[in-house]
């Protein structure tokens, strides 16, 4: 099983956009936009084992969006960690373990999965992420047995329950530039960040489209005047004025 999701690339926030399923014989795609929450919950919280690859972000997304905790999930990435492959991306692992080279089309790496209908070739691209999961699991387990690493695997799988409540800091706050700020500058940054988030949600656009992260830093460092903010094209004039007024009021405080 695998998901295609929207992560603040084409619209605001994170959204589950497509579910890809392969049962070993047949392929299925589920449109979460057309399925009730109760049906999604019944499917994802069932006792049927679900093979994923590196499922952490997917688990958090369906929990934050639907309150669903994926049950009976087996993450193949745990097997990769046990044998310590140098490259851990799915395609690299498939090439290493199955000698199958997958050429991914770059145009789908930023595909807008919120659009309907989804193009047929995009669906085929999405299904390629589940095509080899059964074979990959078998090949990894075989190598683990051959290298006498079953005890290591048991220790790896005996880990704390997945923390659905843990929230990661926004990417922009992980930058060294932010970390070097004193408390006062961090406070100013956080206020401007929240203002941008609120308007991004209002117009349903990624925050970086409202105005770029670089400008956020420049405002904090006073290297850019509020009136000189360069807004993204999708931001309506009326919203631009409100943002400038709100930031100006904050600046005068």
Predicted feature descriptions by range:
Residues 56, 130-137, 189, 193:
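Hydrophobic faces of stable alpha-helices that mediate helix-helix packing
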Residues 90-103, 229:
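A polyampholytic, Gly/Pro-enriched intrinsically disordered region
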Residues 77, 105-114, 210-216, 243:
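Short linear loop/turn motifs
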Residues 103-163:
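Acidic, Mg2+-coordinating catalytic module of metal-dependent nucleases/exonucleases
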């Amino acid at each position: 099983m695998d998901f295609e999701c929207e992560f603040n690339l084409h619209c605001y926030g994170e959204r589950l956009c497509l579910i890809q399923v392969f049962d070993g014989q047949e392929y299925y795609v589920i449109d979460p936009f057309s399925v009730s929450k109760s049906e999604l919950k019944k499917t994802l919280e069932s006792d049927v084992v679900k093979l994923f690859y590196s499922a952490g972000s997917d688990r958090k997304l369906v929990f934050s969006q639907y309150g669903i905790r994926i049950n009976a999930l087996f993450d193949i990435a745990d097997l990769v960690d046990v044998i310590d492959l140098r490259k851990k991306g799915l395609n690299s692992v498939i090439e290493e373990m199955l000698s199958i080279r997958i050429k991914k089309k770059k145009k789908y790496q930023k595909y807008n999965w919120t659009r309907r209908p989804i193009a047929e070739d995009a669906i085929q691209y999405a299904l390629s992420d589940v095509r080899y999961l059964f074979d990959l699991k078998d090949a990894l387990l075989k190598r683990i047995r051959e290298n006498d690493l079953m005890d290591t695997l048991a220790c790896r799988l005996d880990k704390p329950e997945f923390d659905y409540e843990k929230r990661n800091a926004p990417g922009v706050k992980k930058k060294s530039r932010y970390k070097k700020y004193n408390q006062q500058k961090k406070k100013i940054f956080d206020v401007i960040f929240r203002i941008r988030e609120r308007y991004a949600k209002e117009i349903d656009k990624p925050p970086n489209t409202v105005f770029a992260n670089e400008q956020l830093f420049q405002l904090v460092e006073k290297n850019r005047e509020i009136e000189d903010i360069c807004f993204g094209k999708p931001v309506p004039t009326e919203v631009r004025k409100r943002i400038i007024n709100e930031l100006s009021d904050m600046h005068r405080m």
